[in-house]
Each structure stands twice: as C-alpha cells, then as structure tokens.
C-alpha cells in the first residue's frame, strides 16, 4: 500500500494495519465461519427453536453451543461450514473504495468492483429487484427467516457499496442496480402505522415491523436515493420511518432494539446503527429534530456503553447472559459513528482515538486479521467476515480516508 504523507502517527499505524489485513484476506479467502455458525446448521437450528418454544428444555439444548462460544470458539466448525456473506462483501467493497480514494491506487478500486460482482451473484434469487439476506435459515423468536429472504439490515449496505463505487467509477449497469435496490426498499419492504406521523419498517417483506434500526436503515436508504436519483417521492416514504425512529427514543436518550414490549434491550452496535443512519440523514436534510435526538443519544451512548478502559461495552441493558467483555463489531461501529459525528459532537474525537488505539494494540493478530471477541477468559480468534472482519476493515479505511482529506 502506498504511503500517505502528512498524516498523524495513529493514521500511519492504521495504514500499516490495513496493508497487513488485505494481505491476510487475499490468503484466507472470502468465505468464513460466522457469528451464527453454532445455530446455522440443523442441530443448532433445532436447539434454538426449542429454546424459543420451551425455555427449560431449550436452555439445556443450547447450553453446549453457549459453552463452546464462551470457552472454545473454534468449535464452530463442528456445527456449520464457511460461507459467503453479502453484508461482508458490501463492507469489503466500501473499504477498498475508501482505500482507492485515499491512495489513488487503481488496484483497490478493482478489488471493490470484484466484491460488487460477488454481490450480483448472491442477491436473493426469488425477488425481481436486487436485494440481499443471509445464506442460511435464521431461527428467531418470531419464527424462521429462510435463507434468501431479503433483510433491510443487509440490503442498505449493498446500496451504499454500489453507490460509493459508482461515484468513483460511473457505470450504467451499477446505476440500474442502485435503482432496483431502491424499488425493493420502497415497495417490497413494508411499513405500518404507529402514530399519526410515524410508520415502522418491516425487517423482511413478511413481518409487521417494530425493530428500530430497520426503520433507520430504510429511511436513510430512501433519503440517500432521493438525492442521488432526484426522486422526491422517496422522501415521502422515508419521512414516517424517520418519525418512528425519533418517537422510539427513550427519555434517557437510548433506543430499544424494538418497540414490541419484549425486545427492549439496549446494546452497542444496534445503537450505532440507529445513530449512524440518523447522522447520515441529518447531513442530507439538516432536520433540527434529528440533531436534538442525536445530542441525547450521544450523551447516553458515552455514559452507558463504554467500559472503564474506554472500549465499547456490549450492553447497557442486556437481554440475557453475556459471555464476552468486548466485541469487534461494537468497536467497528463505534469508529464509524465517531467519524460521522465528531464535527457536531467534538467529545467523540477522544473516544475515536481511544478505540482505534485499543484495536491496534490488542486486537490485531500476527497474521493481519482481527480478534473477534474478548471473552471473559481469553479471546475468540476465529475470523468471521460478517462479525466483524469486514466492518473493522471498512471503518479503519474510512478513518484513513478522512485523515488523508485533512492532510
């Protein structure tokens, strides 16, 4: 990777880390085990389904997986196989595009285009428009989401990836895919009235909504598309979703995972998802209501979702037993959020620097990849592209990109 002049010592270390990571990725490959590997195969799916039906019997059924997750993470290989994750490919595409923009190296853009080509092949096969989900059956408390079902928490990342690459290298085919993604987001994904001004987005084309970050994702995608495509009709679809997110904020500034009376936990990366989307929307429309909500959110975030060492805490209100102290995914999303909002909220700058320094000091393995989790005892060192090798790669590339702009 070419050097960048006049950047901070921290950015120089990040550049070296990114160089080493891209070398590791080339050797390791583009499929990996996953956070859900314990429960993606037939044994894990049956155990998890039983847990949701009968807590007593289900707890006994999932106990071996939870034990392995806490003490022997490499046991994932006993339950499933490495898979390709579209959400990871989207993050890799964005990360390599950031590197191209920072380094002006055509090879990075070629790599980004490569991951877009992978996304074209892994779209949900049963839908007319471009959309993406998981390549495994996902057992949830509300039933099984079958492999190939579009997820509004995945498709927006593909939208961002295609849009970012298009802005670096315009291509008519990519624009058509962007337009297709937008049609899917506006029509296949549904919304449901929650107040006179608000509507909640569905998570898939088949559910009744309620998950806060789902509405945030949909609103941002449609707002961004409205500007890119010059289609103000998309704003009318997005606005009620924005209102739902704003109305879902708790009095203390936090956001629950869902407004369904059940999943009211507050965790790190879902909080980041909501605030990231609001931050991007605010930069598009300057809505003062959003800035006010973000101010309350940032205050809660900094006071409740960090450990004493300055690294992210998984939960401020946990829904269940937590078998780890810190997660790579939380760190990656923290970096993204701080980069998006540090100008509006300068107090995030020190958080940004602390988390990046912590990652570089303790989370980078000798082979160039990242540790996945700091467990109660030891580390989960299994590389998982969705959880969150790709997200950390993108967030550090985003940081380097921003540093080169300042330089």
Show the residue positions of the predicted features:
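Glycan-recognition and catalytic cores of secretory/periplasmic carbohydrate-active enzymes
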Residues: 1-407
């Amino acid at each position: 990777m070419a050097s960048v002049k006049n950047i901070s010592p921290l950015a120089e270390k990040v550049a070296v880390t990114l160089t080493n990571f891209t070398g590791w990725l080339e050797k390791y490959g583009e499929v990996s085990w996953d956070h859900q590997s314990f429960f993606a195969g037939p044994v894990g799916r049956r155990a998890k389904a039983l847990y949701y039906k009968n807590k007593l019997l289900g707890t006994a059924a999932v106990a071996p997986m939870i034990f392995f997750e806490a003490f022997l993470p490499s046991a994932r290989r006993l339950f499933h196989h490495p898979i390709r994750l579209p959400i990871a490919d989207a993050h890799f595409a964005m990360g390599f595009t950031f590197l191209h923009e920072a380094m002006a190296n055509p090879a990075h853009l070629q790599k980004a285009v490569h991951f877009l080509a992978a996304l074209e092949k892994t779209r949900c096969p049963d839908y007319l428009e471009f959309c993406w989900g998981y390549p495994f059956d996902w057992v949830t408390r509300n039933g099984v989401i079958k492999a190939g079902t579009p997820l509004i928490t995945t498709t927006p990342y593909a939208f961002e990836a295609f849009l970012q690459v298009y802005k670096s290298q315009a291509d008519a085919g990519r624009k058509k895919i962007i337009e297709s993604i937008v049609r899917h987001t506006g029509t296949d994904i549904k919304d449901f009235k929650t107040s006179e001004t608000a509507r909640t987005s569905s998570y898939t084309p088949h559910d009744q909504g309620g998950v806060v970050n789902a509405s945030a994702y949909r609103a941002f995608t449609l707002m961004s598309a409205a500007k890119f495509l010059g289609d103000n009709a998309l704003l009318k679809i997005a606005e009620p979703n924005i209102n739902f997110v704003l109305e879902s904020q708790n009095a203390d500034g936090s956001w629950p995972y869902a407004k369904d009376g059940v999943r009211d936990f507050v965790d790190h990366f879902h909080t980041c998802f909501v605030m990231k989307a609001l931050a991007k929307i605010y930069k598009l429309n300057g809505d003062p209501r959003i800035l006010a909500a973000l101010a309350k959110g940032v205050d809660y975030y900094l006071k409740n979702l960090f450990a004493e060492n300055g690294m992210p805490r998984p939960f401020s209100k946990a829904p269940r037993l937590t078998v780890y102290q810190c997660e790579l995914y939380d760190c990656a999303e923290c970096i993204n959020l701080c980069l998006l909002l540090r100008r509006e909220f300068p107090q995030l700058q020190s958080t940004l620097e602390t988390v990046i320094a912590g990652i570089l000091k303790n989370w980078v393995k000798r082979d160039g990849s990242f540790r996945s989790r700091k467990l109660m005892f030891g580390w989960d060192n299994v590389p998982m592209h969705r959880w969150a090798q790709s997200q950390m790669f993108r967030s550090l590339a985003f940081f380097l990109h921003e540093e080169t702009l300042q330089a």
